């Protein structure tokens, strides 16, 4: 089998796998979307609990942390990873993982927002965010990007303590990115919690599917 045929096979298998998973998730969320369109009392309670911590310094810190989950940061970060693995490390499959997970996570997030149609909180702390609220795009993209980074670290760093230390730092960053969206009152806590769960499930499914695909293609 030639290189062109293998490339076509890879693209076809990736698209088919992701389309299947997307269809299943879409069917599930379509059946439960109505109860989620409105925020819950717990969401408002969490806003109230955070209020005493609101001040100018914390506002600046939260704005910086939330930036680490924005597309303005994640797009260049993904591109750096792609070119690093493709051109420097010569590890094509890691590049494929980055591209596939980044794009599919974005598509899934946009699809779910349109399905649920939940409005954002009415009183943002500093500045209103655009788009719909559920699930949190920052939470989904933070889990899939930084979670993939953890996966890469597990396969790249041989020093146990350093690998564990960096993993803990990245997990803390993911949690803080989600918290920053609640602090800034641009998402309800339930938006963020759902984003974390969806992002983690999608990351695990994508990694498993791509690992199987890599094994299948390399065996040809």
Predicted regions and their residues:
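N-terminal transmembrane-helix/juxtamembrane module of multi-pass inner/ER membrane proteins
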Residues: 1-73, 115-121, 125-126
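Membrane-embedded catalytic cores of phosphoryl/pyrophosphoryl-handling enzymes
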Residues: 2-4, 122-220
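Alpha-helical transmembrane segments of integral membrane proteins
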Residues: 12-17, 93-101, 162-169, 194
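Alpha-helical transmembrane segments of multipass membrane proteins
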Residues: 20, 24-25, 29, 105-109, ...
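Membrane-interface helix-boundary motifs at transmembrane edges
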Residues: 35-38, 85-94, 157-161
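Hydrophobic alpha-helical transmembrane segments
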Residues: 69-86
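Interfacial segments of alpha-helical transmembrane regions
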Residues: 83-107
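Transmembrane alpha-helix/helix-exit interface in multi-pass inner-membrane proteins
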Residues: 102-118
